[in-house]
Amino acid sequence: MDDGVGVRAGCIRIRCPSPRRIVSRWLSPQGKVKGKKTPMAEPRVRDSDTVRIRTSSEDDHHRVGQFSDSPPPTIPSELQRREFLFSIGMSCYLIHLIATGRQEIHKIVELRNDLDKFLECRNEELRQKQQEFVELRNDIHKFLEFHNNELRRKQLEKTETSAYSATSDVVDGPESSTDHYYSPQIIQTSMSVGGEGSLSHYVYKLENDSGGEMDQLEAELEAEFELLQIGHNQEVSEDAEGLRLGHVCPGLVEEQQGVCPYELERRLYELMETRQQEEIKELEIALDDAKQRLHLKETEASWWKDTAYIVSERIPEPSRITHSSRTHPYPLSR
């Protein structure tokens, strides 16, 4: 009976070397194993069976040690899924970067076009104002030339009038036997002339009171003629002084002229120069502002390009990912 049990136990150990059973037997405490064995079956186990059991148990224990030290192998489908998700994420990020950079580039192009249009409009306005200024200057020169010609013509007329009046200073009345009229003899004539050549009052003292209204009319005509001659001489002297100085406006200016043409030209020139300087300053300020904004946009665009380049450089290739996953396997997430 004991022999049959021993042989049967030996056959079970040899014919069914289950790794789980062997591991459980070797990892279980020794007391339990000894309790299960019968004292009569232990001395009857063959030496060859014990050697086989020991070798098989050592191999199984070595295999179990290897399995416990190394992590479980990863599934190829899980690795491919992870690579696919990583590639999709990086592709979406690159597409976003490219779209953002494209929008920024379009904004920069629009800003540059607006700046070119603004500068072109300003240049056109400056050309128009310069043309208007040239036309105005030509008109002023024509007006000055016409005014000088008028002054020369008036001066010639006044000289001719003064020469003619010098020859006819004395006016004699008609002498006839039938008429008893005669020219009155002016004893004293006192006149006061204002600053502008206007007559204030006349005082006539006649030697004889005979003659009546005719004598009084002749006296008034004589006084008016002398007044006109005095005013004419004063105007000629002032015109000659103005022509001699050149840049000074003539003293006697007609009411319809208003402002001296030289002074008008000087003021117009100063006004145009001031406006042009202000417009140039405004254009320079606008140009500096546009250049600054353009520089900021270009800096931002270059930053986006550098970021995209760095990200594309850091993206590993599929072969590198596969090789690294095979050499350094990592456990699946539970």
UniProtKB/Swiss-Prot annotation:
Residues 273-300 form a coiled coil. Disruption phenotype: Decreased accumulation of ASK7/BIN2 at the plasma membrane and impaired polarization of ASK7/BIN2 in asymmetric cell division (ACD) precursors thus leading to its nuclear localization in the meristemoids. Keywords: Coiled coil, Cytoplasm. The keyword Coiled coil applies. Residues 53-74 are annotated as: Disordered. It comes from the Eukaryota. It is found in: Cytoplasm; Cytoplasm, Cell cortex. InterPro entries: POLAR-like (IPR040348). This is Protein POLAR-like 1. The gene is PL1.
